[in-house]
């Protein structure tokens, strides 16, 4: 297939229409809340090898996380279903993962279990005495809450104290609120990070209730109230050396939720202001949250700077009086550093590079282990064209982890369980159950034909979805079955999801080598890579290489020259003494950048070559890294023409949602293309039980703002793949957005 070069798209005749309001079409009236029952009736099933082992494994996983000192988000919620095969007199179990169930008390989980049980259509050889157990981890107090729903429709709640390994706790209102906050934070972080998702996960829209605005306000209030305990929520260790008031999962969640509820920003700020008066001891947490949110939305800069100055000035005046080697002092200095980083970013965006440099220097002095401070310092030097100083700042940065410790523990457990088997683009048998296990499974799914059920079993996971919310034939009946769910640490590209033969057919070995999991940059390396690319963009690769040679003594250079570096007088020459030793990770990054630039140059000189869909995807990802935006879009679009590619689709939609700041003023993606891609992505996500879709909601919100919701909906209806099943989901999402857009100021 030839490269899909961008061309001017003919605009379709737009159907005129006014503002969209909830209820202006019959399917919209259903709303999200009416989808929940169908969602609960279309859950995956993971077959246990030994009865009850998922609960046993969960207990041991929690122990491992606690003993590691990094509980993080804790394990994802699970639902376990206990059955009895009457003929064999043998118990067997099924389970699946779930997020987004409201756990402010036992009522909603019990209702969820009731719906799940009532939807069961079991065969005669399976006993009706089904027992269901819902588990949710409270990471504030290290409690695992387990709600057991018995065959006689009674339930009991057990709180396991994972620190003491006791079960004699009585759930209090405070514990329930902690559990609810834990589940909301986990739902948001999991939904926005594909690498955290295990196959067999159902993601419910936690933000949906009978009243959209009230439900969203309730979540915002909940997260804001827990800000003083945000340091107990864990953090992403790939982005920060330690948890700070800004860098923690609670703050990440609050920012992500505000991104899909922009009309509630004023409400959030007012609520936080109220908390500063009600709880003045913790006002620094609430004020920092206000600043972080306003900085994140980038539309209320004056308000942000006002609150920032009001917060920073008194803090900076305390610096000389802070006791040394004190934990509270360290936390306060980290907070000041975080706020100064926000100020630096604001000044850089305003073009005030000199003042930004001064602020960044202060931030770095306050927190020498702050990546963000050193990163901003390097940015300031690059803007001032002081490239050698920028490289020195980069070389001085604390090296962050490539993989988060919490994620590594979680995923290693999943890999050892060996429950999931990839279909590899339909090239291998992915059904992995014994005859008895299949009999038991089909006994709990009575209405499924044997061949059709086996087709939807991936290893030991039955990925059935009979209610077909979000269904489109081209996605569900074809590529979704061939590729399976794209999730986990390998979801950065399709190398591990297509057939081995397709990978072998790629002629350019370097293209594969640069895109293996081991060669993925990670968040930390990706940020540094971006700084190096900014320098390359200004002075070219040779210019960067010359500055590197003048500034650094590379490791290989040091060992090669160690015998010859001393002059005839026994002294080390001044030229060598002036050089700094280059960190090994930075040396490796220079080599990675060189390889990518070389590959992109070769590809650009061979635009007429034909490639497979996977090759176009991998080329597109390299073009993205090397800032060839137009070529990246062309490659990724061509990949999707060859075969719908969820990875390429996600990258293209990211470019539309958050265009790179250095992108040229050219429209790389028209709205018709975006709409077509978004429909496919919504459908793919629904196929594997993602009904939360925070990223897709952001895209719909942006399209609504650009086109108007009425025109957008008409454009969606013109798409060839549109049917009733996908429109139910899209209409629910549009209705939710419309409800928020019609928010009356509180």
From Swiss-Prot:
Query: Other remarks on record?
Result: Present with 1180 molecules/cell in log phase SD medium.
Quote the InterPro entries the UniProt record gives. Answer: ChAPs (IPR015374), TPR-like_helical_dom_sf (IPR011990)
The gene coding this protein? CHS6
Pfam families, per database record: ChAPs (PF09295)
Q: What is this protein called?
A: Chitin biosynthesis protein CHS6
Q: What is said about its interaction partners and assembly?
A: Component of the CHS5/6 complex composed of the 4 CHAPS proteins BCH1, BCH2, BUD7, and CHS6 as well as at least CHS5 and GTP-bound ARF1. The complex interacts with the cargo protein CHS3.
Q: Which compartments does it reside in?
A: Golgi apparatus, trans-Golgi network membrane
From the broadest rank down, the organism's phylogenetic lineage runs: Eukaryota, Fungi, Dikarya, Ascomycota, Saccharomycotina
Q: Knockout consequence?
A: Abolishes CHS3 localization to the bud neck and plasma membrane, with increased protein localization to the trans-Golgi cisternae.
Q: Per its database record, what is this protein's job? A: Member of the CHS5-ARF1P-binding proteins (CHAPS) which mediates export of specific cargo proteins, including chitin synthase CHS3.
Question: What is the originating organism of this protein?
Answer: Saccharomyces cerevisiae (strain ATCC 204508 / S288c)
